[in-house]
């Protein structure tokens, strides 16, 4: 199997894309650490993975809290050993509670909460995971970004800015740690049938079709596997061609 011997920590894996990635990674032989806000959903996902013969555990990591991230990463390593794959997939909690607003209607707190949940969370997860990857001789970090970082989506200012920051963070991580065997890449996700995407306005026109979580899972699998060992600092756009139909957006 493609991920035998690997340990993957996937944030935001209680539903949608994250849950699907966790199932796909486990099916390819990885030990998977799921994390998210819902303990009940997380534990049910672990049961499903174990029922299919995979190995998994759940940790309720708050990716916006440095203490929670530090303790969660330590707990994952205590259970499974060094993390070889980090998937920064968690979406900002505040995005669920904030209606789509133009910039002048946002409070500073709303802005800060969404940006913190987008890019600061990826920084914190990387900060506490990378040292163990370096000790183990390398690893792969995959940042799950959004087409909102590329296009100016009305009402999604802080989310677009946060995900744009994540794209830049990918390049910094690749530059900082590439010579030490740690790779970092971004998947820019278009419209996918999931909880988060279903809340947004219909602003895209895909050449192919609306995506599903497995479309993103396949890209993440490749970036986590050794077959992509020469790829770092790159962006993979998985949006059904919507980027090239921008005149219709």
Task: Describe these PLM feature segments.
Residues 7, 14-15, 38:
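Conserved glycine-rich cofactor-binding loop
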């Amino acid at each position: 199997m493609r991920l035998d011997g690997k340990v993957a920590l996937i944030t935001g894996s209680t539903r949608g894309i994250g849950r699907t990635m966790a199932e796909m990674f486990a099916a390819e032989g990885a030990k998977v650490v799921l994390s998210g806000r819902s303990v009940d959903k997380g534990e049910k996902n672990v049961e499903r993975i174990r029922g299919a013969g995979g190995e998994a555990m759940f940790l309720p990591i708050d990716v916006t809290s440095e203490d929670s991230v530090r303790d969660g990463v330590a707990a994952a390593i205590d259970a499974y050993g060094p993390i070889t794959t980090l998937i920064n997939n968690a979406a900002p909690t505040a995005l669920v509670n904030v209606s789509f607003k133009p910039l002048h209607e946002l409070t500073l707190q709303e802005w800060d909460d969404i940006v913190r949940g987008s890019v600061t969370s990826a920084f914190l997860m990387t900060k506490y995971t990378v040292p163990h990857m370096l000790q183990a001789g390398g690893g792969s970090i995959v940042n799950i970004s959004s087409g909102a970082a590329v296009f100016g989506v009305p009402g999604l200012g802080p989310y677009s800015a946060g995900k744009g920051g994540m794209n830049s963070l990918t390049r910094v991580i690749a530059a900082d740690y590439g010579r030490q065997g740690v790779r970092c890449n971004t998947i820019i996700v278009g419209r996918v049938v999931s909880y988060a995407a279903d809340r947004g306005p219909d602003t895209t026109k895909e050449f192919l079709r609306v995506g599903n979580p497995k479309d993103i899972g396949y890209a993440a699998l490749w970036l986590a596997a050794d077959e992509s060992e020469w790829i770092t600092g790159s962006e993979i756009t998985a949006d059904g061609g919507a980027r090239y139909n921008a005149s219709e957006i």
